[in-house]
Every structure is written in structure tokens, then in C-alpha cells.
């Protein structure tokens, strides 16, 4: 009897020691969230005389919260110029300390927090990107970013990156970005951004600077997004400049149907961004039919709006392009000064 009692006491003591060494919890570890999207398209190009159907893109995203941090990664396989390629489109480790949650620190590859347009189709309201998005500003950074929320209406951010749209640094310098974002009204968001750094291969000279401003207005049935990008690059005695502006408007006509229009202008008088001195203009208009709402995730809304990303969206658009200098190459290799394109795009978010 005495030995049994001693054994029970020893077992109890051992269990208490084990409990002190390893905390007991009944909470389940947060699962890895898997989401993504797929894009199918039909394109018509008047200048080349081509009509093409394509399974254009598929992206798979992983999201994993770990304490005060989270990991977000996205692998994207896209078809471009007839060839498919897979890349790490986003890979971000972000940490927000619970004792100072107005701060957040991120590291990896991420969308440049500039302007209204994004490179992923579900995050846009129209199925083509503007000349301004393509030429006037960076779309991706690889580096680190810091965000500080001063108040619910004011946020500041800073980025140190390898450069404009490069995964590996192409020179010894780094590109710096600062951004201030202000919400004066609950339906208005204004952002001001500055970017500075060397961008040419194997050279720390020719510093490139960019001033960018973007405005988003969300009035429920009407969403307007506009951006202005003014850039300059230092060069011996020339200092070429460029200016890109774009404005997009979306009107919700019914519960499931909307209409989008965009005007875009890219002025490149020195040809530093487009290859030849020119002014590019485009007008794009088209309807969107959307059904159901995608599940909640790291990207659940069009940025700075209450427009919830639909699970299924069918979008059509007619786009007219003009250039002050022949720029659009036809099937015979001759440049033309104008072009017309038609697009039918299906986007499915899972």
C-alpha cells in the first residue's frame, strides 16, 4: 500500500515537471491557407490581324500565420509571347508585434505600393494594363518594407529594394521608396510616393527618381481610381523625363453587372522608357459580369475600395491605342501609329 502511494506521488510529481517544461494548450495550429486564381482569354489585335485563345495564367497562393507574423507566397504560371513560364510572383514574410501593432515589417518580393493598377487580374477592374502601368513606374520590389500606422486616417511606409522589377540586384546600389497614405474621408484615399535609386545594369550612376500620386474614390456604385507618375533619370547633359497618367472609372449597373472605362497617357519625349520619343494614348471600355464573392483572404477587395473580389468574373473590353510616332508593329514588321484590340477574359478565384 505504501509503495503504491509513493508511486502515485512520484507520477504526479513527474507530470507536474513535464507540464512546466512544455506548455499544454488545446488550441489548434493555424492551417496553411491555399487560394489562387485562373485566367482564360480571347484576344483580337487589328494591327497583327490575329485572334488568339489562351489559358493565360494560373496562380497558387499560400498563407500561413505564425504568432505575430505571417508568410504569404504566390507561384504564377503565365503565358507570354507563346511561351509559359513560372515565377515566384510574391513571397512575403511580415511581422506585426502585438505590443506595437502600429508597426509592421516585411521582407521578400511584393507588389510596389504605387498607383491604382496591379499585375494580378483579380485586383483590377478591366482586362488590360495601361501604358502608365507598363512604362511609367515599378510594379514589383524585392527587398524589405516598413509600415507605420499613425492613425486610422494616416499611414506611412518605406521600402529598400534591389530596383525596379528586378529579382536580383543589377548593380551595387539600392532603390529607396517612401509613401504617405491619407484617408481624409471614409470613401477617399490619397497616396503620395517618392522613389529614388540607380536602375541601369552594372552602373550606380544615372540615378532615377519618380514622384507618384494616386487617388481612389469609392462611392458604392461608383469607383474611380487615378494615378500620376512623373519620372526623371540623370544622364550627361540630357536628364530624360517622362509622365504617365491613367484614370479608371467603374459603375455598378446591377447587382452582377458593371461597366468600366479607362483613359491613359504616357509621355516619353526622350524615349528612355518606351524606346523611342513618343506620346502614347489609350481608351478602354467594357462591361464586367461577376458572380459570387471570393472567400476572405489576404487580398479580398480591390485595394482602397469596398468592392469585394468576385469568385467568377467575365470581362470584355475594346481598346484603342494611338502613338505620336509609329510604334505598333504589324504582321509584316512595319510600325503603325494606331491599333485596336478586343479582349474577352474569364477570371476564376479559388
Where do the model's predicted regions map?
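Bacterial N-terminal signal peptides that target proteins for export
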Residues: 1-5
Amino acid at each position: 500500500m505504501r509503495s503504491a502511494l509513493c508511486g502515485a506521488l512520484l507520477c504526479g510529481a513527474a507530470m507536474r515537471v513535464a507540464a512546466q517544461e512544455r506548455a499544454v494548450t488545446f488550441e489548434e495550429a493555424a492551417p496553411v491557407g491555399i487560394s489562387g486564381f485562373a485566367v482564360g482569354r480571347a484576344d483580337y489585335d487589328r494591327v497583327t490581324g490575329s485572334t488568339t485563345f489562351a489559358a493565360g495564367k494560373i496562380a497558387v497562393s499560400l498563407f500561413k500565420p505564425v504568432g505575430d507574423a505571417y508568410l504569404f507566397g504566390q507561384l504564377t504560371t503565365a503565358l507570354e509571347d507563346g511561351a509559359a513560364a513560372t515565377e515566384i510572383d510574391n513571397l512575403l514574410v511580415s511581422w506585426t508585434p502585438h505590443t506595437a501593432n502600429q508597426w509592421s515589417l516585411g521582407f521578400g518580393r511584393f507588389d510596389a505600393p504605387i498607383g491604382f493598377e496591379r499585375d494580378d487580374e483579380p485586383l483590377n477592374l478591366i482586362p488590360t494594363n495601361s501604358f502608365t502601368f507598363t512604362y511609367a513606374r515599378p510594379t514589383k520590389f524585392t527587398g524589405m518594407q516598413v509600415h507605420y500606422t499613425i492613425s486610422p486616417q494616416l499611414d506611412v511606409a518605406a521600402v529598400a529594394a534591389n530596383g525596379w522589377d528586378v529579382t536580383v540586384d543589377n548593380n551595387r546600389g539600392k532603390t529607396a521608396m517612401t509613401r504617405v497614405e491619407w484617408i481624409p474621408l471614409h470613401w477617399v484615399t490619397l497616396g503620395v510616393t517618392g522613389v529614388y535609386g540607380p536602375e541601369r545594369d552594372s552602373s550606380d550612376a544615372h540615378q532615377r527618381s519618380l514622384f507618384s500620386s494616386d487617388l481612389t474614390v469609392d462611392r458604392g456604385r461608383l469607383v474611380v481610381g487615378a494615378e500620376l507618375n512623373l519620372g526623371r533619370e540623370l544622364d550627361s547633359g540630357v536628364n530624360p523625363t517622362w509622365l504617365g497618367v491613367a484614370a479608371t472609372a467603374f459603375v455598378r449597373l446591377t447587382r452582377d453587372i458593371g461597366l468600366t472605362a479607362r483613359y491613359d497617357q504616357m509621355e516619353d519625349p526622350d524615349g528612355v522608357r518606351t524606346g523611342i520619343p513618343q506620346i502614347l494614348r489609350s481608351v478602354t471600355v467594357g462591361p464586367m459580369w461577376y458572380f459570387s464573392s471570393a472567400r476572405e483572404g489576404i487580398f479580398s477587395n480591390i485595394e482602397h475600395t469596398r468592392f469585394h473580389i468576385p469568385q467568377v468574373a467575365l470581362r470584355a473590353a475594346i481598346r484603342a491605342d494611338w502613338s505620336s510616332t509609329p510604334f505598333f508593329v504589324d504582321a509584316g514588321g512595319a510600325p503603325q501609329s494606331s491599333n485596336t484590340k478586343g479582349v474577352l477574359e474569364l477570371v476564376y478565384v479559388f
